[in-house]
A protein has these predicted regions:
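Buried hydrophobic-core signal for structured, non-transmembrane domains
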Residues: 9, 52-60, 102, 136-141
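Short beta-strand and strand-turn-strand segments in soluble, beta-rich domains
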Residues: 74-89, 110-114, 333-347
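Short acidic, flexible loop segments centered on an aromatic residue
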Residues: 61-80, 289-295
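Short solvent-exposed strand-capping/beta-turn motif centered on an Asx-Ser/Thr pair
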Residues: 58-64, 75, 143-145, 278-280
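Intrinsically disordered, low-complexity Pro/Gly/Ser/Thr-rich segments with frequent PxxP/GP/PP motifs
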Residues: 81-125
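Surface-exposed extracytoplasmic segments
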Residues: 185-220, 237-493
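Terminal connector regions
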Residues: 107-163
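Beta-sheet-dominated interaction scaffolds and their linkers
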Residues: 15-62, 87-92, 119-125, 164-190
Length: 494
């Protein structure tokens, strides 16, 4: 087996040869910069065929002309992705440079989610999360046999994306149909281990949060957006900010919640939370999402649902999960038999587009939080996220002086026993929660309303509505919202 750039970069380095070599091959980067690999990164393929190109610069620092034969050696392959060089050889004059191109061509409907053959599909006996990649190395083989072969790593993660929106139509009595419109993804057998199948989930929208600014790299404060006031008032405390643009994967945009109690009864019901962010999550290891739940209406949280991951010998794995704990740190429902669910509600054998995505979902049984099924089915809750650099974003939560998370004065609220909005797919006895449902043009989600619960739900940052999660849409369009009225006049869906 050959280890690809996704795992080992260019591979081993012959240090003496690298130091004595007089010809360099590198990639032209943005704004006249240079990088050492032809990485196309994550490629969201929305058109039938996507073509991207990189320019390779060959710099000859010697006093003699050099000629190299060009070829591409694949290490890992992905169906639907191919690489092409625009020429078979290159000649570079003494003390000068020359260039050639490599093109990546991705056919949207041929893409499959295949795993690197050097990577185990499981970790700690669970299907792992992974991204498909097509990678290898450009070989520059010298015509002069006394010279060394040059290698440039090539890498991409291509995935098909859906283009789905929705229309809500009233069907009478505060019920309605959400009909999906657009193009889904159906590459391979639906839900297969190497397939891409678009998925949809629906939630009650209860939280909305504005985008955080990026911190000033010198001061750690938000960058100014206007000219400074020549006679300013005393400076206020700086607000929260994201350390970098990419760290906005912890920056909360939307929060949704739903329950399937109307289908299965409260004892067998699950709570589902969705957290949309202002930037895609690169890896679950660097961002933690928590939902804090007040189970007895005393203003303090009693339960925490949090994203984490299984470890293997102390090392993190690609098996992200959701666990629950009480205020004393005891696991739910017990330390001896904790309930553990997968982040995004499914193992890595079903593609839920977990990596490089701007939304995650968390699922947990209501019965593991007994206060919710006793006297207090309506609970207050807040969401807190922590980024790679330790930055914190709060919606309905705050951080105490000693760094402990607490609920804020203003929180969201929801009723697990009598959900305000119930979303289902299928008819009659075949109806199931509209969570990770296969989606395509014409898919219909039924919506029913419990008016009493709906009017008592409490939102933060915006109005009530429906939060649609199109898992496989392009980043930035995965979360879509449908505004709804307050319901105080008895009308929710009209």
């Amino acid at each position: 087996l050959i280890y690809g750039p996704n795992r080992v970069g260019a591979g081993r380095i012959d240090a003496p040869a690298a130091v004595s070599n007089e010809v360099l091959a590198y990639v032209q980067g943005p704004a006249d910069s240079s990088v050492v690999s032809a990485s196309f990164g994550v490629v969201e393929v929305s058109t039938p065929v996507a073509t991207l190109a990189k320019t390779i610069i060959v710099e000859n620092t010697s006093d003699r002309q050099r000629t190299y034969d060009l070829s591409y050696a694949a290490a890992t392959t992905q169906p639907g992705v191919r690489y092409f060089l625009n020429q078979r050889s290159i000649t570079v004059a003494a003390n000068s440079t020359n260039t050639f191109n490599i093109r990546m061509v991705a056919n949207r409907d041929q893409l499959r989610k295949t795993i690197d053959p050097t990577v185990s599909p499981t970790q700690v006996d669970n299907p792992r999360q992974f991204v498909a990649d097509a990678s290898g190395r450009i070989l520059l083989t010298p015509r002069d046999g006394s010279l060394s072969t040059l290698r440039v790593p090539v890498h991409s993660n291509a995935k098909p994306v859906s283009a789905l929106t929705q229309e809500l139509t009233a069907t009478g009595g505060n019920t309605g149909d959400i009909t999906l419109v657009g193009r889904g993804v159906a590459n391979g057998e639906a839900g297969g281990t190497d397939s891409y199948t678009s998925l949809v989930s629906a939630f009650s929208l209860l939280g909305t949060s504005p985008e955080l600014p990026v911190c000033d790299p010198d001061s750690g404060e938000p960058e100014p957006t206007v000219e400074p006031d020549p006679d300013p008032d005393p400076e206020p405390e700086p607000g929260p900010c994201a350390a970098t643009q990419i760290e906005k994967s912890y920056d909360i945009a939307n929060v949704g919640v739903t329950s399937d109690a109307a289908l299965y009864g409260e004892d067998d019901s699950f709570l589902y939370f969705a957290i949309g962010t202002h930037a895609p999550l690169v890896t679950h290891v660097h961002t933690q999402h928590s939902v804090f739940i007040d189970g007895n209406s005393d203003g303090e949280w009693d339960y925490q649902l949090l994203s984490t991951y299984f470890t293997d010998g102390g090392d993190p794995t690609d098996v992200p999960v959701v666990i629950g704990a009480d205020r004393d740190g005891n696991l739910l429902p017990s330390n001896e038999e904790p309930f553990i669910t997968y982040l995004n509600g499914a193992p890595g054998s079903l593609d839920t587009n977990l990596k490089d995505s701007s939304v995650i979902t968390m699922v947990f049984p209501a019965a593991a939080m007994p206060m919710l099924l006793n006297l207090y089915p309506r609970f207050a809750f807040g969401v807190q996220t922590i980024g790679y650099f330790g930055s914190v974003d709060n919606l309905g939560t705050t951080t105490s002086a000693d760094g402990f998370p607490e609920l804020a004065e203003q929180t969201m609220s929801y009723n697990v026993r009598n959900p305000s909005l119930t979303f289902t797919v299928g008819e009659g006895d075949d109806a199931v929660p509209a969570y990770l449902a296969f989606s395509s043009d014409g898919t219909v989600i039924d919506v029913t309303t419990d008016l009493s619960s709906y009017t008592r739900d409490r939102t933060l940052g915006g109005q009530k509505g429906i939060m649609m999660v199109h898992t496989h849409n392009v980043t930035g369009q995965q979360v879509q919202t449908i505004p709804l009225p307050s319901g105080i006049d008895g009308v929710v869906i009209a």
